[in-house]
Design a protein with these regions (language model features):
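Active-site-adjacent helix-turn-beta-strand microarchitecture at beta-sheet edges
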Residues: 5
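Second-shell residues forming the walls of enzyme active-site clefts
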Residues: 49, 53-196
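Glycine-rich, aromatic-flanked loop segments that form ligand/cofactor-binding clefts
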Residues: 1, 11-34, 54-79
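Surface-exposed, active-site-proximal loop segments in enzymatic domains
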Residues: 1, 37-47, 86-89
Length: 196
């Protein structure tokens, strides 16, 4: 079996052809996060700690997903870094904006350049962009995605049932998400969130 970039592209193409055969035409992948610590929550899901190598993997993955006839979703903008798991609580990202410019944005820029039609925004509170709201609910973070990175595709939230946004009522989170600039909302809590 092929390894490295060729292996990644071949496996990604195969997996996404299987998704399409099942009627699934959007894949919540690839993970574009740069994680430098093997003990971090996102590390096992990321392509690693080097922004340049992660960007190469993201480009290959987006191309293979597209070649399979499936739409790729770049996640978790603006970059997860070494933050805590937002499935189980609030994650505060205290890194300076320059870190995002020099590292975290690069895989997203590569994925956008490769033609990914979707970007998923995380629930991390990224203090250098908006110290009050999770990224998914923050107009400032969405402005960075649209204006600084030039993304003109579809923006979606991470799952609004995650603990990182539980301090908001279901309907409040949905409204804030739309007002922030999300085009689509994800929720796994259908009974409570769909009426919003």
């Amino acid at each position: 079996a092929a390894r490295g970039m060729d292996g990644l592209a071949a496996k990604t193409l195969d997996y996404n052809k299987q998704l399409l055969a099942l009627g699934i035409n959007v894949n919540l992948a690839p993970v574009c996060d740069v994680s430098t610590d093997a003990g971090d929550f996102i590390y096992a899901r990321s392509f690693g700690g080097d922004a340049a190598a992660t960007s190469e993997f993201v480009t290959a993955a987006v191309s293979a997903i597209r070649d399979a006839g499936v739409a790729a979703v770049l996640k978790h903008f603006p970059g997860y870094g070494n933050n805590a798991d937002t499935h189980t609580g609030v994650a505060i990202d205290k890194r300076p904006y320059e870190t995002f410019e020099e590292s975290d944005f690069l895989p997203f820029e590569a994925g956008i350049a490769a033609g990914a039609p979707f970007v998923l925004v995380s629930h991390n509170v990224v203090e250098c962009m908006d110290a009050a709201l999770p990224a998914s609910l923050s107009p400032a973070v969405h402005e960075v995605l649209r204006e600084t990175l030039g993304f003109d595709g579809i923006v979606i939230t991470d799952d609004l049932a995650m603990d990182a946004v539980k301090q908001y009522a279901n309907s409040e989170a949905a409204v804030l998400a739309v007002l922030a600039g999300n085009d689509m909302l994800i929720t796994s809590d259908y009974q409570n969130d769909i009426p919003a």
